[in-house]
Amino acid sequence: MRINLTTRRKWLMLPLTVLLVATIALIGCGGTPGDEGGLSGSFKIIGSNTVEPLSVVWAEEFMKMYPNVRIAVSGPGSGVGIAALIDGTTEVAQASREMKSTEIDQAKARGVDPYEIQIATDALSVIVNPSNPVSELTIAQLSAIYTDQITNWKEVGGNDAPVVAISRDTNSGTHVFFKEHVVQMKGLPTADKSLEYGPKVLFLPSTEEGASEVAKNPNAIFYPGLGYVTDEVKLLAIKKTADDPAILPSVETALDGTYPVARPLLYYTNGKPTGVIEAFIDYCLSLEGQQKVIEAGYVPLGK
């Protein structure tokens, strides 16, 4: 189940890998009144490597407000988090992609009712080494790079040097989103669902590793979330088609819809959240929580 925009806006008006806790005893999804702060309870948030830093910030702040609450956050990938929700080994799955229909069917078969909550937005950025003279690419050019049809930077106006295309691994929601919306060019006249990542693409298990490789390798290209971009790499402007303007990723361009590779960041719970988890998500969607989104380098929910 997905929260519609009207409901999400109402939530926004409510007042109001890192493990934050090494070992916790799970005591269920519902919180109980505590001696300090009025809430107590423990739960896990497992999933997206992209969402992990934001969840860590929120969890740290929430546990300061409610000392009897314990939240453990880990980011092995969206697919792992969704599988954990289906298996009942996490209370919250964090994801940088929507659940697949097959995953929803698996969940329902196990008595799990996936409930989707958008908690922020992300501009999926394309980065290269600062020494790379290329400043912009079209979606079609990116697709050609990641399907091994373009293998030399000179083919897109760069140096005569081999392209080193880096991707997240298959457990990553970022991997899936980029495949659908860039590699397969979803929504464009040239869309092709048969396209796959090429055999020359280098798959890495974390966003940090991909960004680090681009900072060191003058021929590398990668696609981290906006929150992972540093001054050690160079952002490329992206054109939806050759006739469209080249747009750099930013909070502003993601919010106004001009950046072509923006995506929702999501939490999934088993049914509508209650108790301490509901209170935590209320905080995430509050004005204070959304300010943390901006501070962490992500895009807040639009009003």
Which stretches of residues belong to each language-model region?
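Extended alpha-helical regions
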Residues: M1-L5, L301-G302
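Bacterial N-terminal signal peptides that target proteins for export
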Residues: I3-L16
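C-terminal motif of bacterial Sec signal peptides marking the signal peptidase cleavage site
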Residues: I24-G28
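Exported/periplasmic ABC-transporter solute-binding proteins
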Residues: C29-K303
